């Protein structure tokens, strides 16, 4: 049996890919539901991790992801549970919530990411990681707010690139994948993948695992099996749940982004995004994205 532990946030929970629980057939779920409770009676979320698990060899799927999780939450709460499972494969897909927080700190993110991925690799797991797309671009926010979000996304992606290189993860570049920005890939909130988007993520990881020599079955189908929401349904969501989400975030995120925008304007950076190579992040003292010592007590090279 191939044991798969899925760590992360609502993307890994499957938000945006609603199904009725009876429709999900495939991997045995040893910890955590493969269909997570959804927003309406009798419905839940499936998502890319469950879709990917269907193509693995006799999979045992452990969904440890938690809605709203940041990287520090994954390190503190999900990593210990994952290490107890000693999975063959583990995914660490998280970061969007970090970019949307007023207390954003790339150094703390780097330390937590390095410890989490390093510990899983030291325990023998193949680790799946991701470069995340720019949330400001997906949300379509005004440029004055989009620029700080873009910088945050690039900083976190640099961290994950560094972590992926040092620990040898299977790293999916969702930020650079042209299909990522197809509107059909996104749910009404524009922060979570639609069923089509979850299928894209599952297919990309399926390809990476196959290239790494894993015995995998056929890749998940690219085409959705459920009818996509109507434009009316999307507008209804945005006018009800979406508005509530914005109001909850406005006391935390928006003031912070506005302050960043003012700072950028004063420094002359507020008229465009940095070039791709200008991420403006270097690890601070004590925040190199790797643990000093692995689980066997040996220092990591570097």
Question: Language-model features: where?
Answer:
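Serine-esterase "nucleophile elbow" of acetyl-processing enzymes
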Residues: 1-67, 79-86, 294-296, 301
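Oxyanion-hole/transition-state-stabilizing segment in secreted/luminal serine hydrolases
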Residues: 13-19, 71-108, 134-135
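Alpha-helix N-cap and loop-to-helix initiation/capping positions
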Residues: 40-44, 104-109, 144-155, 189, ...
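Residue-level recognition of beta-strand->loop/alpha-helix junctions
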Residues: 65, 131, 173-176
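Generic structural signal for well-ordered alpha-helices
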Residues: 113-117, 157
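A short helix->loop->beta-strand "cap" motif at the edges of active sites that frequently abuts
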Residues: 122-127
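Substrate-gating cap/lid alpha-helix
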Residues: 137-174, 195
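Conserved catalytic region of serine esterases and O-acyltransferases that act on ester linkages
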Residues: 166, 189-192, 196-302
